[in-house]
Amino acid sequence: MNKLRKLFVVIFSSLALVIASFSTAFSKVEGDTITLGAAVSLTGKYATNGEHTQRGYDLAVKVINDRGGVKIGNKNYKLAVKYYDDESDAKIAAALAQRLIEQDGIQYMLGPYGSGITIAIAPVTEKFKVPMIEANGASRALFTKGYKYLFAVLNSADQYLNSAVDLMAEQAKAAGKNLQM
């Protein structure tokens, strides 16, 4: 299984736990399907990454559904995703998140591509108490607001290089060099 596939299985495993813990009483459930919402950049400057995000979400949904879906109580549910194109625009993304929640009845969100757009959507999902699994936002600002309904699978960006810097310092010390920071 390649790294991308593993990442999205982790994302959706996390989502499955969130869904199971919040119950289906308030979710968009039609028959045996739980519909998730996502405002993703399919056009605009983030389109390439948004398309990768959408394909990753679709792959994860397929893998989970092929394995029987998400079990809540004694019942298994398949997953589906309702997408809207946020046009790589934070304001449009926030409006679409609100539309997904208020008009489409979505109660579980998948995050968009990028920190800036996630920063715009997070207050909307918080306002409506809708859990959002964020796979592509890493800005420190996402982790310092005290969001209760935002679940991230990435570390914050300021933590990305910590282990690399530690390794570099360790190797410099082993080579007898004094690394100054």
Segments the model singles out, each with a brief description of its role:
Residues 1-35:
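Short, low-complexity disordered leader/linker segments with a strong preference
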Residues 29, 55-80, 173-175:
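Signal peptide-proximal N-terminal region
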Residues 31-33, 37, 76-78, 95, ...:
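Extracytoplasmic
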